[in-house]
Each structure stands twice: as structure tokens, then as C-alpha cells.
């Protein structure tokens, strides 16, 4: 056993002064236990592009409605009218005349009147006459606002919407007859003056009424038995047994 002291034997295994063990690895091959470059191990490395998205340098898409839309839903095409200044309203032109201007006369005038109407081939129907009116129009009475009328106050020749209910004639009415001479008229609700005569005695009854009597007992099986007067015993109360 050698008594030589070696400094490498006194240093721990993780010390940097201890020479590392020589491994039999070929040049150009990395260790299997360490991953490749990543943003955590190599901050200067460019970030990796997520799979599924096109690179930023890709050519713009040629779609019929313009460039690729941007926003919350880029896959939905834009809706509505194309961008641009709105057109004038109402549209210019003679489509509608300005307000307050009368319409022009038609270029082609319509047909004028053709003359008197032709005589109808059927006679006009006769108007209904009121009840009791004469058949000959010449014999009818004076024509009033409600049809032919006679001179009497309630003549039968009066016409109207209901011929059987005559209307008063607009002519002069007969004079109201004077009141009959005698007792003066008394206003309603007053007692006329004068004696009313003695008070007559009130007539008595024509005969005497029969004395009331108890009705005869009928053949009723549910007769109430005769007993002492008073209220019947209450149900559930004390009973007297005989």
C-alpha cells in the first residue's frame, strides 16, 4: 500500500479541480441525456413556429372577395355593401316629381262625352205609393218634403219611411179648443178647496172566522211522542233511563 497523498483523492466528485473522466464519445454526437437547443437552454435561439400556422412570409391568399379578412372570425367572409361613400338619396332623375308641384296634363287626352245617353229599353220601375194614396199622380195632394201630402192634419195620404205611421202635415194646425167652463183647473199635487163630506165608518168583517183548532193527526209513522215540554236531550249528553 502506497503512502502517497493525492490531491485528487481529497476533492469531492463534483469539484471542478478534479479532471473529468474521459468518455468514449465520438466527435459530432451530442449526449443522449441533454435536449437540443430551446428558448430555456439557449435564449438567443429563434422561437419555434407552432405547427398548423403558415409562415408569416407566405404569399397572400387570392380569394374573390379581397384579401384575407382579419378579426375574431377570419374564416367568415365580410357581409354588407362594399366599402365606399353612400349614394345620393333620393336618386336623381324624373322618377318622382318634387313636392308641391301639380301633376302635368296627360299627353294623350281621354275620350270626351259621347252625347246623351240612349233611351233605356225597359221602363223605369214605379215608385212605391203610400197606403191610401190616389193612383193618378194628378189627383195627389200637394208635394211636401216627405212625399205627397193632403191638406188635413192626419190625412191618410202622408208618405214616409213607414207609410203605416203617418207624420203630421207641415200646414196650419187647427186652433186648440178653449177649456170647458166649470171648476178651475187645479195644479198637480194640491188639494182643491171645498168640503169633502163626513167620514164614512169603516165596514166591519162580513162574517166571523172559525176558531183555530189543532189539526187532526195523520197516519204518520214518524210522529213525535208526547212528553214533557222542553228541549230534547243533546246527543252525547247524559240520558235518563227508566
Curated annotation (Swiss-Prot):
Residues 13-29 have a biased composition (Polar residues). Residues 1-145, 192-242 are annotated as: Disordered. The modification N-acetylserine is found at residue 2. Residues 44-53, 75-114 have a biased composition (Pro residues). InterPro entries: MISS. Residues 30-43, 192-210 have a biased composition (Low complexity). The modification Phosphoserine is found at residues 2, 6, 15. Keywords: Acetylation, Phosphoprotein. Belongs to the MISS family. This is MAPK-interacting and spindle-stabilizing protein-like. It comes from Mus musculus. The lineage of its organism: Eukaryota, Metazoa, Chordata, Craniata, Vertebrata.
